[in-house]
């Protein structure tokens, strides 16, 4: 661009990371994650809208909540909570998350109660493997260990 005569203007900047190479950029990015976390059975005990324990009346899986919140406060994750709870339970769910002190960026409701598969691309700028999955036993407080 410079050789073709394009004009450039300087801008005063602060608080930026100059990686310089693709390798350095990829190393820097590895600090950051986007976590898709299922609510029931991982952050609170499993619930139902058909029978007890009902949605909104679950017990907190506090060790898992603490592990997730620590990542949230470190500022290097985006937390997207997912659930099979129907959309009509959004207000109850958001209130439950607030009551239990669960931090998050987004909530996706209404997933089918079925197998979940994450499909992601990879490239030089997002090397293989670019995605991972953790399957954990329902209602167990072992998220911190599984996240490594």
Predicted features by range, described:
Residues 1-32:
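Conserved alpha/beta core of the MobA/IspD/sugar-nucleotide pyrophosphorylase nucleotidyltransferase superfamily
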Residues 30-148:
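HAD-like aspartate-dependent phosphatase fold
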